Regions:
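Active-site-proximal mixed secondary-structure blocks
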Residues: 1-170
Length: 170
């Protein structure tokens, strides 16, 4: 696969459609270099502090949380529709117990700016370095949002990832 450097807004409509549908694939790497992937359905590409960013939400209970906290980086990968089953699987099992890349037939590929891998089978990749992290405060959440998404606690940490590079399959 050949990759071309593109801007943050390249195929933004595709990124948003996938996020609202089957989800995006968030990759990280643990301190030993083991890659991990999880599905995310919440996020926000944009501009903060005059920099391109991709904001993602990760719960502290997730294996990915530990990886991002340790390395300070992640990649948001935009899958094709044909990866719907992989997105489903990566959103339901933990990388602590499962080799999700292998189980889903996904190929980790070295990126250009971070150690977290790109996913070869995806069409767009946002390589990010954490600029800021904030924990959601349960008591400050809208009551309906709190009831629907945080009944058991485990509020997300919000990561503002500076876009170090956006790569598209050509």
């Amino acid at each position: 696969m050949s990759l071309e450097t593109v801007g943050l807004t390249h195929k933004l409509d595709l990124t948003l459609r996938r996020m609202q549908g089957q989800g995006l694939l968030l990759t990280s790497v643990d301190p030993d270099g083991k890659p991990n992937v999880m599905t995310i359905g919440w996020g926000n590409p944009g501009v903060v502090w005059g920099r391109p960013v991709f904001v993602v939400l990760v719960r502290p209970s997730r294996y990915t949380f530990q990886n991002i906290e340790t390395t300070g980086e992640f990649v948001v990968n935009v899958p094709t529709e044909s990866l719907a089953e992989a997105c489903e699987h990566c959103g339901t099992v933990s990388g602590r117990e499962h080799a999700k890349f292998k189980e889903c037939g996904l190929t980790p590929r070295a990126g250009r700016h971070v150690e977290a891998p790109l996913i070869e089978e995806c069409v767009l990749h946002y390589e990010c370095r954490v600029l800021q992290r904030n924990d959601l405060v349960e008591s400050q959440l809208d009551a309906d949002v709190r009831k629907e998404f945080y009944g058991a606690g485990d509020c997300h940490r919000v990561y503002y990832g500076e876009g170090l590079g956006t790569l598209a399959r050509v």
